[in-house]
Amino acid sequence: MDKDFKIIDGELVEYYGNGGDLIIPDGVASIADEAFAENLSLTSVFVPASVSWIGDMAFRCCSNITGFRVDENNEFLCAIDGDLYAKDGTELINYAQGKNDTSFVIHEGVTYIRNVVFKYCENLERVSIPNTVKRIECAAFRGCTKLTRIEIPGSVEELVRWVFAECTALTEVRLNDGTRFIGEGAFASCTNLRDIYIPDSVENIFYDAFWACDKLTIHAHKGSYAEEYAKENNIPFEAIKP
């Protein structure tokens, strides 16, 4: 079975197999960045106790994986409802995109959501983000084409590049006090986005954060940075009553 893998000094860097239910070989210590990226033949993944680290975007856009399993003796990783987390529950590493679920609740205690965790996940209509989350990485929700509304807790200070780009069914976004920055293309090509509620804590918005959001109205307090941004970028503005 090891012939299906390229393993260098304990790191699994490439996969040559036929997919299906994948068992990572025991003894593998880490999985390289993008090792299985865009592999549509995988349907499930078992991670042995020996794996201590999974690289960035290791399972990016593996859209037919219905579940991850992790050896109960693994000291660094675990699976919760088929999704891959750090053992201490603070990091969401991979969402099993092959599930048919239309809603997902990120577990309380998660502080960090990795790059592209939900990218091009076409089933999700609703995602609940707890106020323990502090960082959502690049393109985490990009191309979630059925996602309709999202509320982002104020614990997330920065919305990074393309985090919700191409969410074409998204109609409403609510940010909460504490968020400070809306980054490059954060909501680009959200072509049905009609309303975003922006708190006074936001002090910087990248110029193309709402590129191709032609139906958008920005809701914020009068005199806020968000009002200034809306006027400078010819985006309709509606003042929130104090």
Residues covered by each model-derived region:
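Structural signature of tandem-repeat unit edges
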Residues: 1-8, 16-30, 39-53, 63-90, ...
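Consensus positions within tandem repeat domains that build extended binding/scaffold surfaces
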Residues: 33-35, 56-58, 93-94, 115-117, ...
